[in-house]
């Protein structure tokens, strides 16, 4: 059916899109600095900086969200490399993981730093094997 074809094309183009973004340098505008709480869900505390990438729209119609690793103080913005993508299996949006260009993180290290929020979702962490 036409609808099923559209879903398959969407899934393939999404996979290509994710693979193309891994390793890219992006600028994250921080709207939830390290040490703050989620504006709506007050029990979610941000142990790392979190924000969005201006001009890149996510499937939820908002700008692409990103976790920032490797920065140990609250910041307003950060430029770094997309080292992983958190693909939520039960949500429409992915979260990108951005870190300083010269830092490497294992899947386990990434998971440890994002679980404060991702524990509420089913997800997989996508990354290039060369990041390990």
Q: What do the predicted segments below correspond to?
A:
Residues 1-20:
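Short, Lys/Arg-enriched N-terminal segments with co-localized hydrophobic residues
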Residues 20-132:
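Hydrophobic N-terminal alpha-helices or hydrophobic patches in metabolic proteins across all domains
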